[in-house]
Each structure stands twice: as structure tokens, then as C-alpha cells.
Amino acid sequence: SLGGKPDLRPCYPPCHYIPRPKPR
């Protein structure tokens, strides 16, 4: 995530490198 909600997998900064469906 972009430092917001946790995605499906543990995201490391920068998170935006991993395109993941973020629940909004």
C-alpha cells in the first residue's frame, strides 16, 4: 500500500511498485 491500508501481501516502501487491488 501507499502507507495506508495493508494489501494482500506485506508491502515494502515504495509500495506503489506493486500493483495490488486496494480496498477503498
Swiss-Prot record:
Location(s) in or outside the cell: Secreted
Principal localisation: secreted
Record's function text: Waglerin-2 selectively blocks the epsilon subunit of muscle nicotinic acetylcholine receptor (nAChR). Also has effects on rodent ionotropic GABA(A) receptors (GABR), since it potentiates I(GABA) in some neurons and depresses I(GABA) in others. In mice, it elicits tachypnea, ocular proptosis, rapid collapse and spasms, whereas no toxic effects on respiration and blood pressure are observed in rats.
Covalent S-S links between cysteines: C11-C15
Reported tissue expression: Expressed by the venom gland.
Pfam family, one: Toxin_33
GO MF terms, alphabetically ordered: acetylcholine receptor inhibitor activity; ion channel regulator activity; toxin activity
Source superkingdom: Eukaryota
InterPro entries found in the cross-reference section: Toxin_33 (IPR012637)
Keywords per UniProt: Disulfide bond, Ion channel impairing toxin, Neurotoxin, Postsynaptic neurotoxin, Secreted, Toxin
Quaternary context: Monomer.
Protein name: Waglerin-4
Record carries keyword ATP-binding: no
Source organism (scientific name): Tropidolaemus wagleri
Record-stated family: Belongs to the waglerin family.
Gene Ontology CC, one term: extracellular region
Organism phylogeny: Eukaryota, Metazoa, Chordata, Craniata, Vertebrata
